[in-house]
Amino acid sequence: MQCTVLLLDIFTRNGFIVMTIQMGKNLESSGNNICAARIHKYGSPLELDDIRKPTISSPEEVIVRVGATGLCHSDLHLINGDWQKRLPVSLPKTPGHEVAGWVEEIGASVPKNSIKEGDLVAVFGGWGCGHCIYCKRGDEQICQSAKWPGLSEYDGGFSEYLLVPSYKFLVRVDGRATSLKPEELAPLTDAGLTPYRAIKKVRHLLGPNKNVAIIGIGGLGFYGVQYAQILGSGANVLAIDRSDDKLELAKGVGADFTLNIAMLEGIRKKIDIITHGQGVDVVLDTVGLEITLDTAVNILNRNGAIVVVGLFGREIKAPLFQTVIKEFQIQGSLWGNYNELCEVIELAKKTKIKHQIKKFSLSKVN
């Protein structure tokens, strides 16, 4: 069996990366074996392995033929061994939780009107228990028993096929109603979903004459700028980063103002000029370092909100006096739920969301 004919899509421009794996048209499996890129040792390159194709053992299960799988920083944390204590998994492990593809096989109890073989689907990655209060209210991704593909005992999508524990975790994308491709859908399941939920949490604070800042224009920030425009009801969108090239990307998707934090001695002074002394009403921190939170607090308006989605740091520190006196709100936001993924895909169908993708072979995955 030849594994190297898979394609790896990557969007990279001066350090901004969104990766997807797309199966090549000429890939041929041998028997019941499939190809997967797996972690054998933390901090080491992924290895291309021949493994057994997953089989259905439960009536709700579905096998998806992978069309594309995104690589986000959570995967890199896993591959590098940064999360051995937070998310212990048995090795070897196939990473990849941003997955889109086609239904290959369905279990016996999957309703016929839900999905069928051949359907294009996006895989929702928060596989909750379905019974707890969080799952019942629709927030499966924060279920205490949630399993994530590639980040739990379930293997992920750096493979030809993915076993999904229930059809309920699949969003069917009607091919007749959209020109979306798997490589466009895959990043939406996390990189495109996480900032959407975060902005939705605080959209009541936005509107005309309001200001929202996106700190960190990587994969999450790239989408975050777009959602701030879509959901902000006329609010000014400020993009903050250390790279002029990334800030140019932000301008291209709707940022009204850009600030290179590396070149500013007093960012609050610049913010005051832009906002006429008000400060920023909402900050989306896609980085999650102490320095970015300090920046967020420094530029925040009274009664403003900071939503943290980045996981680069280890702890959050906030000034108690300012937080109380100015009624700051500081909250975390994890991923997004199934219904929010459906909303994101609908926006993508209407071409409200921009994508940038390149391709190269899986043999260059490392």
Where are these regions (language model features)?
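C-terminal substrate-binding/catalytic core of Rossmann-like NAD(P)-dependent dehydrogenases/reductases
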Residues: 268-273, 313-366
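Acidic carboxylate diad motif detector
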Residues: 309-310
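Glycine-centered, small-residue-biased loops immediately flanking beta-strands
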Residues: 304
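Glycine-rich beta-strand-centered segment in the early N-terminal region that forms part
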Residues: 52-69, 83-133, 155, 174-178
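NAD(P)H dinucleotide-binding glycine-rich loop of Rossmann-like/cofactor-binding domains
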Residues: 129-215
